[in-house]
Amino acid sequence: MGILSGGLPRMAIEEPAGAAKSPSDPGFDLRSMRAALALARRGLGTVWPNPAVGCVIVNRGRVVGRGWTQPGGRPHGETEALRRAGEAARGATAYVSLEPCCHWGRTPPCADALIAAGVRRVVVALEDPDPRVASEGLRRLRAAGLAVETGLCAKEASEINAGFFCRLRLGRPLVTLKLATSLDGRIATRRGASRWITGPPARDRAHALRAVHDAIMVGSGTVLADDPQLTCRLPGLGHRSPVRVVVDRHLAVPQSARLIAEARQVPTWVLALSSADSARRQALLASGVTVVEVDPDTEGGIDFKSALNALGERGITRLLVEGGGQLAAALTRARLVDRLAWLHAPLLIGGDGIPAIAGFGLEAMTDAPRFKRLSIETIGGDLLTIFRARE
């Protein structure tokens, strides 16, 4: 399953079955790389602004080291796997979900570490488009005499780090819009009743989605109406709660809101216009909230491209949007939604209910945002469909 359809990455890693018949047995290579990808997924939501990388080291058909990028982006997956492998890494094959880095940062280059450990062969799923790497890691490995192969499970590896690549390419995070609606696309009755449209398994999946995103965004209207916490409340996963982001151009959310009151426990950022009340701004800062100034659009509202760029500048690579119909419409209309995670419940609310996405003002079908379905899954009595925006 995909990252979104599968929710939180599986924590049990399957070991490649059987011994390799040769140094480059395709079946064994595939199983080993899939294990590396599963490890990479563990880092999602915790390693930003870095990519999530998994590494499996195999010597004579036996896994001798596993690693994945640790919270905060350090140590890297290769470093962790080499540490666990120790001397057994000499003469081994390393399966890495993304090209090993070759630049100095807070830690030495992973390419150099693989060379120094005596690894004989490196299988890489995907080359790293980061200008600091950009095939230089592969070149360095080959120059040292290591056998290097690329492209195995490249599509899966690309999806894992789609947020990292989006930030590199566009300067903003990958945006996933999560909707939970009736069959006719409503999120509440005409009087605002919305609890609960989906069942408990679907709501658990929504919390799992939060755990694999760097940040979660809602509008001020959602905060004023529902006073949400926006945390991951699955047992044992509270520490994976994402940064809470509130779009609040005039700083209308009160100090009593749970997002504000708990800002020192879970990071909370408020996106506001520079013209917002300075006294309210200071009160939020005193509560531990980070206030991010963004540019206005032509109508005096939040310019969402500017807002997402501001999040990208702060390192956010994966953003989950759970706001109401106005926020969903604004982002979709601006062509800023990259993925849709749509939960449909088997009930009807009717045309007078509140729609999941407010009006676009479209006049022609050719102007409609279009998406490609990636997966569909039954969760309890509900249906989760993942879509990708067509480029």
Where are these regions (language model features)?
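Acidic, glycine-enriched active-site microenvironments
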Residues: A12, G27, A52-V53, N59-R60, ...
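A residue-level detector for well-ordered beta-strand positions
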Residues: C55-V56, L179
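Proteins enriched for Cys/Gly/acidic motifs involved in redox and nucleic-acid/cofactor modification
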Residues: G45-P49, R74, L138, L152-A180
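Enzymes that bind and transform nitrogen-containing heteroaromatic metabolites
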Residues: I3-L4, L8-N50, R66, R106, ...
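Zn2+-dependent cytidine deaminase-like catalytic core
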Residues: I57-E156, V243, W269, S274-A276, ...
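Short, flexible helix/strand-to-coil boundary loops that buttress conserved ligand/catalytic motifs
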Residues: L126, N161, R191
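Short capping loops/turns at secondary-structure boundaries
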Residues: D130, A134, T150-C153, L168-R172, ...
